[in-house]
């Protein structure tokens, strides 16, 4: 999935993590913990003070009875939604929390059954009340199907399962349900955030080897279309970009937003593509992969190299996300203290560096790009370009140090805002039309010899 390229990162990465800032100057970027150690409501209520000692800004949690299945028709009594317990949780440091919801049901999604969807919508309205009562930001939505009975997979299309209706005919039902889904969730939480761990990246990957209608996520694009149609002006759909689990360089993080939106829009009808391209992007860190917590993840890296990989990925994830980084783990448990030594400090140090850079009050920021590869102990002397950014005029000046550079791209968080080919050795960009001085500025240069040069400006 990821090409082997030589990568260059801005020297600003090397700013000391000792630049700690008071709480009021924290970055708007947030890191959310999610994993097999997800807490239930009762655990949260009893342990929130200790939990908030972990280096996160929020957590993905579940009800006591189980992970909530989005298409569940079970008519549960109100007490199972734990409104009272949720209202009594004393959140302080954890400001951005999400209820774990799976895109599944033990009896299927009932796409064609209006009566079942009356029950599903009633339940989702209760979930919406849960979000309002708990002051959670929204749901962490996992559309992957994990169960052995494939006939209950809501996203697979087989004509024989749907009264021999065509793919498009079933899709119209699924689209209707996606609209009902988000509208029900907006009932009590109009500003809900739906963090989709996968949006359309998974079907994008599956469709490379087979027709879309035959993939394991065949019906999911219709559901996403429905969400887009039912979305109000306050709610937000977030692409969790699970692809970022395995990135080994910053290019994947930088290009992900543009790539996900452009390629994902191919699965969305034309009239909804502009709205789809407004979807925000999150970035993921898969701790178990980086630290090789299972044999299949082993790459032969020593402890120091794994630590550099984690640090570099966290840094790039923070710089390129629109708001959220989700830290996923399976074989550690933050809430029982079963975490590798030094990991919490790495997260804290990266957050402090991000905060210091985000709150840099200097009017002018200058830097050179240099080689920084987590597999190496120290940066190379290579310099791709020099840049100077002036805040009050919102002007970016670039001088190429590598004459083989053939393209320059400028990003604001996950969004590509400028794309220049065959740039001059010295040039300036007036950013006023496309950059409102919020979020991070990133410069990506590519050369004719295959090198990619990166600078994180702020």
PLM ranges: what are they?
Residues 24-367:
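Glycan-processing catalytic domains of CAZymes
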Residues 451-458:
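Edge beta-strands of extracellular beta-sandwich domains
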Residues 445-447:
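Conserved structural position at the C-terminal beta-strand
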Residues 431-438:
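Surface-exposed, short loops/turns at beta-strand junctions within beta-sandwich domains
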Residues 362-391:
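Short, compositionally biased P/S/T/A/G/V-rich stretches that sit at domain boundaries
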Residues 1-24:
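Bacterial Sec-dependent N-terminal signal peptides
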Residues 418-424:
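Short beta-strand segments within Ig-like beta-sandwich modules, predominantly Fibronectin type-III
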Residues 425-429:
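Short strand-edge motifs at loop-to-beta-strand transitions and within beta-strands
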């Amino acid at each position: 999935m990821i090409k082997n390229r030589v990568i260059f990162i801005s020297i600003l990465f090397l700013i000391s993590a000792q630049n700690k800032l008071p709480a009021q100057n924290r970055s708007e970027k947030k890191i959310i913990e999610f994993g097999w150690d997800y807490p239930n409501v009762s655990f949260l209520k009893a342990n929130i003070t200790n939990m908030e000692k972990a280096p996160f800004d929020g957590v993905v949690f579940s009800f006591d009875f189980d992970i909530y299945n989005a298409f569940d028709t079970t008519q549960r009594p109100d007490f199972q939604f734990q409104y009272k317990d949720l209202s009594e949780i004393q959140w302080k440091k954890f400001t951005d929390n999400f209820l774990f919801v799976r895109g599944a049901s033990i009896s299927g999604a009932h796409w064609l059954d209006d009566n079942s969807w009356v029950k599903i919508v009633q339940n989702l309205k209760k979930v919406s009340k849960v979000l309002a009562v708990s002051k959670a930001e929204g749901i962490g939505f996992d559309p992957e199907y994990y169960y052995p009975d494939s006939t209950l997979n809501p996203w697979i299309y087989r004509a024989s399962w749907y009264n021999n209706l065509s793919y498009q005919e079933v899709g119209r039902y699924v689209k209707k349900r996606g609209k009902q889904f988000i509208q029900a969730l907006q009932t009590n939480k109009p500003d809900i955030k739906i963090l989709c761990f996968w949006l359309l990246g998974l079907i994008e990957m599956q469709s490379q080897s087979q027709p879309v209608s035959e993939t394991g996520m065949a019906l999911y694009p219709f559901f996403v279309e429905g969400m887009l149609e039912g979305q109000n002006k306050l709610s937000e759909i977030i692409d969790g970009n699970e692809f970022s689990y395995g990135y080994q360089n910053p290019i994947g993080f930088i290009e992900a937003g543009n790539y996900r939106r452009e390629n994902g829009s191919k699965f969305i009808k034309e009239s909804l593509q502009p709205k789809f391209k407004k979807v925000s992007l999150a970035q993921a860190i898969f701790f178990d992969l980086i630290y090789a917590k299972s044999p299949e993840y082993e790459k032969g890296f020593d402890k120091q190299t794994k630590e550099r990989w984690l640090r570099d990925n966290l840094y790039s994830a923070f710089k390129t996300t629109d708001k959220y980084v989700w830290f996923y783990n399976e074989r550690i448990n933050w809430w029982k203290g079963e975490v590798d030594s030094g990991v919490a400090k790495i997260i804290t140090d990266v957050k402090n560096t991000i905060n210091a850079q985000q709150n840099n009050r200097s009017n002018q920021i200058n830097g050179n790009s240099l080689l920084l590869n987590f597999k190496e102990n120290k940066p190379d002397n290579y310099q791709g370009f020099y840049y100077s950014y002036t805040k009050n005029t919102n002007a970016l000046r670039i001088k190429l140090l590598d004459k083989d550079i053939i393209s320059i791209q400028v990003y604001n968080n996950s969004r590509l805002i400028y794309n220049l080919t065959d740039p001059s050795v010295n040039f300036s960009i007036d950013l006023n039309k496309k950059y409102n001085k919020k979020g991070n500025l990133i410069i990506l240069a590519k050369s004719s010899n295959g090198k990619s040069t990166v600078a994180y400006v702020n």
